[in-house]
A protein has these predicted regions:
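Basic, polyanion-binding surface patches
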Residues: 1-93, 97-199, 222-224
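Intrinsic disorder/low-complexity segments
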Residues: 206, 216-223
Length: 224
């Protein structure tokens, strides 16, 4: 199973790096987690250096969308058992240690074991708008790999659930993502069509963050 999470690593100077990532959880070992960051990436470098990470379970989709649109500054607090940082808005988190590495030229497999798990707030149920934002974020991470027509079709479908069920946080996150798409279309010189819900303009760094695997994108889920 793959769970969409927020992975926080830090370097030897204590600088935290926040990255949305799809974490693989083997059915036969629920205390084992496989993290697959692309090479090169900050997450990979930090994990190999520190041998630790924090996996955060979060229902605030602004964190996922924010990391893909140049908004990586989210409140953190110290981890409890390892030298690391926890997302302050996480519903729960798991602190892990690196056990072994299966190397790969593109995407190494980092096998980690849980050393501590804590719950912070109750999970209040599934929400279609949150799903829409997560799926849109994955599309954003693949802007340079997917035809714009397909992106438009997917966005039109995801917007249905968003418009019916979104709260303020989901609408804000959606707006950030739509702005990235519009900026990408403008950069490519293609007619934008009727992409909805654009938020405030963001920098070119934000667009780059959505299209480079080293800063937030992944080809199977979201990752960095």
């Amino acid at each position: 199973m793959i769970q969409e999470t927020i992975v926080i690593t830090q370097n030897s100077s204590g600088l935290a790096h926040i990255a949305p990532m799809g974490i693989h959880i083997p059915a036969e070992a629920q205390d084992e987690f496989i993290i697959l960051p692309f090479r090169p990436s900050t997450t990979l470098n930090n994990l190999l250096e520190s041998k630790t990470a924090v996996i955060n379970y979060c229902d605030d989709v602004r964190v996922f969308a924010g990391c893909l649109t140049g908004r990586r500054d989210w409140p953190l607090k110290p981890a409890e058992k390892i030298n690391g940082q926890v997302l302050a808005c996480a519903l729960a988190h798991t602190e892990v240690e690196l056990v072994r590495v299966e190397d790969d030229e593109t995407r190494p497999k980092l096998f980690c074991k849980a050393v501590h798990t804590a719950n912070h707030a109750p999970f209040k149920g599934f929400n279609r708008a949150q799903y829409s934002v997560l799926e849109a974020a994955i599309l954003i991470s693949r802007l340079n790999m997917i035809p714009l027509e397909k992106i438009q079709t997917e966005i039109d479908y995801l917007r249905i659930g968003l418009e019916k069920t979104a709260g303020d946080r989901e609408l804000e996150a959606w707006g950030w993502l739509m702005t990235v798409i519009e900026n990408h279309i403008a950069k490519e010189g293609v007619y934008a069509g009727n992409l909805p819900g654009a938020g405030s303009a963001i920098s070119k760094e934000g667009v780059n963050a959505a299209s480079q695997s080293g800063t937030g994108a992944a080809k199977a889920g979201i990752g960095s």
